[in-house]
Curated annotation (Swiss-Prot):
Expression induction: Constitutively transcribed in minimal and rich medium, in exponential and stationary phase. May not be transcribed with the upstream gene (cmk), there is a probable transcription terminator between the 2 genes.
Alphabetical GO biological process terms: translation
Organism name: Bacillus subtilis (strain 168)
SMART domains (UniProt xref): S1
Domain S1 motif: 16-84, 102-167, 188-256, 273-342
Domain of life (superkingdom): Bacteria
GO molecular function, one term: structural constituent of ribosome
Phenotype upon loss of function: No visible effect on growth. Decreased sporulation at 37 and 47 degrees Celsius.
Coiled-coil positions: none
PTM-bearing positions, type Phosphoserine: 243
Claim: Mitochondrion is one of the keywords in the record: no
Protein name: Small ribosomal subunit protein bS1 homolog
Pfam families for this protein: S1
Amino acid sequence: MTEEMNQIDVQVPEVGDVVKGIVTKVEDKHVDVEIINVKQSGIIPISELSSLHVEKASDVVKVDDELDLKVTKVEDDALILSKRAVDADRAWEDLEKKFETKEVFEAEVKDVVKGGLVVDIGVRGFIPASLVEAHFVEDFTDYKGKTLSLLVVELDRDKNRVILSHRAVVESEQANKKQELLQSLEVGSVLDGKVQRLTDFGAFVDIGGIDGLVHISQLSHSHVEKPSDVVEEGQEVKVKVLSVDRDNERISLSIKDTLPGPWNQIGEKVKPGDVLEGTVQRLVSFGAFVEILPGVEGLVHISQISNKHIGTPHEVLEEGQTVKVKVLDVNENEERISLSMRELEETPKADQEDYRQYQAKEETSTGFQLGDLIGDKLNKLK
């Protein structure tokens, strides 16, 4: 800033001098001022009040306002003055410092124009639409009158060009918050989150400034075909932190671990002797795993599949088949349930007939009947 701009006690002002004036009258298109220590009065044309377009002078100043003004023309009866020129000189110096130090400052949005927002910071500052927010904004109408935190991203005094960014400030704050959150996260902690987006392999959940992944296997205790079957974008959920990779900024989360497990209080839901309907989930050499409740599987040992001898479970069962089973045993601590299909089978009539014929042959070959044997035993006890 020049020495002339700091000089306020000027007896005979010249063009370029800076003087102090007090507003005495506000007209629509100009402002009358009394210049301190100068006999001549001053006039500020409406075009010299601000770097922005002004409809009425009263929108910028009022009577008794004390202003620093630059002399732009000396006439016999009055000095022609500019508030805009003083504001601009000071603004450029201030903006150059802010640009060098990357200082964040605040300014009010004065106008919404095609392509962005306009602020008055002593000079006209422009915020392109792409630099307003970190997210897409369709309509900027509501931004007029808002105060935004800004960063100077481009400055050219010769071209009177000032480009500002609110997005840069937001992204910087988000990055700082993200790092703070990454450092504070603890494995095992349960947090509130919001589902941001769904993929084939899971759901990304915002836990307060950073997204973590809930893998599809961690969405539910039961099998999930696709994430959209369980959660939707925008849904608020509770998640448990499974792991934190601070170097790569990756967080693994689980919704499943915050929900009651399917084995929780299973002893009250399933008891020995219960007959249930289930679905064969897996066949192994030693039996079949049957889902009897969502997320709860029991084992039908190969010896409990059929009254008939079978070599492998595949001979009589297939995955996805619906079967009836009887509960033999429930071990809640080890999450094991023993089931039987054999106990629900009826003994084939052919087998019953074979047994009767066998019994008759035995009685004939020994020369006495079962009843005689029992009778003899009873007589010996008398």
